[in-house]
């Protein structure tokens, strides 16, 4: 048998396709695929132009796919596609133009230029300072970007869109062009352009098909790398906002420190060599002494640029962050005009117009004068710049942030603008924190100043204290120069006797005494409680405190110093005469009497409801028990003054407990709380009756802090209402004072608030006062004193007093009712007589007394 020739084998395989396929799959398929995957490069001869078969084209496509997988640089992958397209299209050159917007204006810039089949990437990659930029209304590439359609120009000399601008720059003649847009959805990403068909007069329809087919790879490359870039940018953006946010909320007091902490922390995510922040002076109106020289012609008026809200542009501080080489931060107060970040005029322009400015090639910029030589010995030069305003919530420009030289050498793009704008916008909004803090700080300082003014006028001065502590008269020196024994000796002669003045009696009346005598009586109560020596209260401080309290009460009709003293005196009487002191420690008794004296200090003569209706600042400051909380704060303010602080020698625990008791006692005077606590007090009274001996009950109560506080709260109510228990000759006068103050509030409600007051505060219903007093006694007061007399029978005189006063008011109310009834009966008799007389007259109208019709009348 002879040898089989190649022609015979080929003929056999063509006739037996199934056998050929089976044999190939079994013996060669694995090896071929392995060799193909292991190949580093497509085995296609690119040295000369020729038509490629399907196998060679498959190798080219596979090579492109592998290139996309292995390369991390979009330009390199696109460059490889363009080299192969040059071969497939037989184009002399190809170029890639990237679509971008600069300062809101769309343009096309060269990214890969003069690519041919034998080109090297480094020769074709265009640096930012060498790029050629086309507006969209210029050249074939501009037309393609605008129309978003492929363009085949057979003869450039006959095409209306062709521009020889690049030919003149490169001394190259473009004869024909094939250009196509690279799209991402409906948006143009880039333009790819092939020029000068080799061996043929122009590009053909077949070339258009090849270009569009291979543009799928370019689209894939662009999308992959664009998504990767977007992911990187969003990651950086998130990190920037996260870290800057953490630093912004660390520093709430000062805008400079806030900006510095935030900007320094995010430096690694900004992807630039340097950035500079200029802070603007926020002064809108000059002081008169700065304006006078201008008005007098001695100094020229400011004629420079201004911010959109009219402020003179003055960078009072510049902070430079240098990130290349050795990191450095420079803070320049009052920077000179020739500072490297300001000399170009760009920050001033941004502050003036509030625009974002993206300078992609700073050395070639002609509007701003950037330094073209190195800035320092490091040789660093400005290449590209991104500058944007920092705007606060009021839309005021507070500063300008300028970023220099993107680290990869490319100019700043849209994503950089978005990222930097997010940072500056966040910083601008965060200015609200230091602004708010500054406003609060100013308010706090004003409050301290006004508080100091009030204390100056309220505090007992060195002349007033001599009315009680007559140290000059006795010793010829000031109180602070005297020993405590010397002060005690003077006070012993000045203070009234408790028994003779009856300051421990429930029927005590302040009417015969002067206000100074009431101050002396108040001081004496502290000695009667034996707390002065026990707690080492400085006697000068005690005198000054009581005198200052008397001055702290306003000169109003009822809630004045006399009322404040009476409440303190009743508290003293309940503790001493009413035997309630047995439940409380000496420290608590000290706090309770002090709270009683302070409980209505700086009262305005109007109640809590009026504060809310009139939108008084107190109502905004305190949500509930408005006036009571104000009285408490006023009293504590006096106690914070060293010269008035009668608690100054208490230890920390004692001081906290005393203030705690004062808090409860003064807030408890709010009658709105009275109805909540009286049931609890009644249960305590009932419980006291279950104990066999007073001693056991006392020991139990001394250990029950909550029950003691409830009893104290009810004691404050009993003290505040104690005027209703005084002898009739006193109570009747005080009731008129209370009513007069209520009527004054009613007048305010009628005139200021344009509202009708309730009957208790209506001056026009003054005759109903006895009836209102009876209702007040029955509804509010009787329960308090009835329960206290049941709790401690020593307090029964107060119940007797209110019972007697109710009889007096009831008698007056009945008298008034009888009088009104008699007047009404007399009026009815007169009307009846008038009607009878009218009906008996000749021709009289019998219907005269009937109500008149609204629709007709009888003639």
Curated annotation (Swiss-Prot):
The modification Cysteine methyl ester is found at residue 856. SMART domains: GAF, HDc. Its cofactor is a divalent metal cation. A lipid is attached at residue 856 (S-farnesyl cysteine). Its EC number is 3.1.4.35. It is found in: Cell membrane; Cell projection, Cilium, Photoreceptor outer segment. Residues 73-222, 254-431 form the GAF domain. Keywords: Acetylation, Cell membrane, Cell projection, cGMP, Hydrolase, Lipoprotein, Membrane, Metal-binding, Methylation, Prenylation, Repeat, Sensory transduction, Vision. A divalent metal cation 1 binds at residues 563, 599-600, 720. It comes from the Eukaryota. It catalyses: 3',5'-cyclic GMP + H2O = GMP + H(+). Residues 857-859 form a propeptide. Its main location: membrane. It is a lipid-anchor. Residues 823-859 are annotated as: Disordered. Residues 483-816 form the PDEase domain. Disulfide bonds: none annotated. One of its GO terms (cellular component) is photoreceptor outer segment. GO terms for biological process: photoreceptor cell maintenance; retina development in camera-type eye; signal transduction; visual perception. Binds 2 divalent metal cations per subunit. Site 1 may preferentially bind zinc ions, while site 2 has a preference for magnesium and/or manganese ions. The keyword Protease does not apply. Rod-specific cGMP phosphodiesterase that catalyzes the hydrolysis of 3',5'-cyclic GMP. This protein participates in processes of transmission and amplification of the visual signal. This is Rod cGMP-specific 3',5'-cyclic phosphodiesterase subunit alpha. The lineage of its organism: Eukaryota, Metazoa, Chordata, Craniata, Vertebrata.
């Amino acid at each position: 048998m002879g040898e089989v020739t190649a022609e015979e084998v080929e003929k056999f395989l063509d006739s037996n396709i199934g056998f050929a396929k089976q044999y190939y799959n079994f013996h060669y398929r694995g090896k071929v695929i392995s060799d193909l995957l292991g190949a580093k490069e497509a085995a296609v001869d690119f040295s000369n132009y020729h038509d490629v078969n399907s196998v060679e084209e498959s190798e080219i496509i596979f090579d492109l796919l592998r290139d996309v997988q292995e390369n991390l640089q979009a330009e390199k992958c696109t460059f490889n596609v363009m080299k192969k397209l040059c071969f497939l299209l037989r184009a002399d050159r190809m170029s890639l133009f990237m679509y971008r917007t600069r300062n809101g204006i769309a343009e096309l810039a060269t990214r890969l230029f003069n690519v041919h089949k034998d080109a090297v990437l480094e020769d074709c990659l265009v640096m930012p300072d060498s790029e050629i930029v086309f507006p969209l209304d210029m050249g074939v590439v501009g037309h393609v970007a605008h129309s978003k359609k492929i363009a085949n120009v057979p003869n450039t000399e006959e095409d209306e869109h062709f521009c020889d601008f690049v030919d003149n720059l490169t001394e190259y003649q473009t004869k024909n062009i094939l250009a196509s847009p690279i799209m991402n959805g409906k948006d143009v990403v880039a333009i790819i352009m092939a020029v000068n068909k080799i061996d043929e007069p122009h590009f053909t329809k077949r070339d258009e098909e090849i270009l569009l087919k291979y543009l799928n790879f370019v689209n894939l490359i662009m999308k992959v790398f664009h998504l990767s870039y977007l992911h990187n940018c969003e990651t950086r953006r998130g990190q920037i906002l996260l870290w800057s946010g953490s630093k912004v909320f660390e520093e709430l007091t000062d805008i400079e420190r806030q900006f510095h902490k935030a900007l320094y922390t995010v430096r690694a995510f900004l992807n630039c060599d340097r950035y500079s922040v200029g802070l603007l002076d926020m002064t809108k109106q000059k002081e008169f002494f700065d304006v006078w020289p201008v008005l007098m012609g001695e100094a020229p008026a400011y004629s420079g640029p201004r911010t959109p809200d009219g402020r003179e542009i003055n960078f009072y501080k510049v902070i430079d962050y240098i990130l290349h080489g050795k990191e450095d931060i420079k803070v320049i107060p009052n920077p000179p005009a020739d500072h490297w970040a300001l000399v170009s005029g760009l920050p001033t322009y941004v502050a003036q117009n509030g625009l974002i400015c993206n300078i992609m090639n700073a050395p070639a910029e002609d509007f701003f004068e950037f330094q073209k030589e190195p800035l320092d010995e490091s040789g660093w030069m400005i290449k590209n710049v991104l500058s944007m305003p920092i705007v606060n919530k009021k839309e005021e420009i507070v500063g300008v942030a300028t970023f220099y030289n993107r680290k990869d050498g490319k100019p700043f793009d849209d994503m950089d603008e978005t990222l930097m704008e997010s940072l500056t916008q966040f910083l601008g909004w965060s200015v609200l924190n230091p602004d708010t803090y500054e406003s609060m700080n100013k308010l706090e300082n004003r409050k301290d100043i006004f508080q100091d003014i009030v204390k100056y006028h309220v505090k007992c001065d060195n002349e007033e204290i001599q009315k009680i502590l007559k140290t000059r008269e006795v010793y010829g020196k000031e109180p602070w120069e005297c020993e405590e024994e010397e002060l005690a000796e003077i006070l012993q002669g000045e203070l009234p006797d408790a028994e003779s003045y009856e300051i421990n009696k429930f029927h005590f009346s302040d009417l015969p005494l002067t206000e100074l005598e009431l101050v002396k009586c108040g001081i004496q109560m502290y000695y009667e409680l034996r707390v002065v020596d026990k707690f080492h209260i400085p006697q000068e401080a005690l005198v000054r405190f009581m005198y200052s309290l008397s001055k702290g009460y306003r000169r109003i009709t009822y809630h004045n110093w006399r009322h404040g003293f009476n409440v303190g005196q009743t508290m003293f009487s309940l503790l001493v005469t009413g035997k309630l002191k047995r439940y409380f420690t000496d420290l608590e008794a000290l706090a309770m009497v002090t709270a009683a004296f302070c409980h209505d200090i700086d009262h305005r003569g109007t109640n809590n409801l009026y504060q809310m209706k009139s939108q008084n600042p107190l109502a905004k400051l305190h949500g509930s028990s408005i006036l009571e909380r104000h009285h408490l704060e006023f009293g504590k303010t006096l106690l914070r003054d060293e010269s008035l602080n009668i608690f100054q020698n208490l230890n920390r625990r004692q001081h906290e407990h005393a203030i705690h008791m004062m808090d409860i006692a003064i807030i408890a005077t709010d009658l709105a709380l009275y109805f909540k606590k009286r049931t609890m007090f009644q249960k305590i009274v009932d419980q006291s009756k279950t104990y066999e001996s007073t001693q056991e009950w006392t020991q139990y109560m001394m250990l029950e802090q909550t029950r003691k506080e409830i009893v104290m709260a009810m004691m404050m109510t009993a003290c505040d209402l104690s005027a209703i228990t005084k002898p009739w000759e006193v109570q009747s006068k005080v009731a008129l004072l209370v009513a007069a103050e209520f009527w004054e509030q009613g007048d305010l409600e009628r005139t200021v608030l344009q509202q009708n007051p309730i009957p208790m505060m209506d001056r026009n219903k003054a005759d109903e006062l006895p009836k209102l007093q009876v209702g007040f006694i029955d509804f509010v007061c009787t329960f308090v004193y009835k329960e206290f007399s049941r709790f401690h029978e020593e307090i029964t005189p107060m119940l007797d007093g209110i019972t007697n006063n109710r009889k007096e008011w009831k008698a007056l109310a009945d008298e008034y009712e009888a009088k009104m009834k008699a007047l009404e009966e007399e009026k009815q008799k007169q009307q009846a007589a008038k009607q009878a007389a009218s009906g008996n007259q000749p021709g009289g109208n019998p219907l005269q007394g009937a109500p008149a019709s609204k629709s007709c009348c009888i003639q």
